Amino acid sequence: MRHRKSGRHLSRTSAHRKAMFQNMAVSLFEHELIKTTLPKAKELRRVAEPLITLAKEDSVANRRLAFDRTRSKAAVGKLFNDLGKRYANRPGGYLRILKCGFRAGDNAPMAYVELVDRPVDGEALVGAAE
């Protein structure tokens, strides 16, 4: 029985899931907007939001924890230099998931995952639409 088991398997091994969400979190922090399937988007929240909460307090220990979870120096730098300061007064809820229809090949429900309060300019909207 599968009682009290949290999280989605997504037809992947645990190592594959961990690597996938690690990569998705790095992409989200880099671009601030990504497009993925709805179940992956909902599960990505469980990975990305605690990292942003960690970045709100800049310390060597927190930077090492963030690097351990992302394995990307660029992502850690952006987390602590930009995102941690941007969300310093927000008590959670850093991500927004917007449903955006269904994928053409397999009809999978798709969604955009974006950081709330991100700076929006005309170029970012053109890049997101493509």
From Swiss-Prot:
Assigned GO CC terms: cytosolic large ribosomal subunit
Statement: the UniProt record of this protein carries the keyword Ribonucleoprotein: yes
An MF annotation (GO) of this entry: structural constituent of ribosome
UniProt keywords, alphabetically: Ribonucleoprotein, Ribosomal protein
Domain of life: Bacteria
Keyword presence, Heme: no
GO biological process: translation
Family of the protein in this entry: Belongs to the bacterial ribosomal protein bL17 family.
PANTHER family the record matches: LARGE RIBOSOMAL SUBUNIT PROTEIN BL17M, RIBOSOMAL PROTEIN L17
Subunit structure: Part of the 50S ribosomal subunit. Contacts protein L32.
HAMAP family to which the protein is assigned, alphabetical: Ribosomal_bL17
Name of the protein this chain belongs to: Large ribosomal subunit protein bL17
Organism this protein belongs to: Azotobacter vinelandii (strain DJ / ATCC BAA-1303)
Gene (name only): rplQ
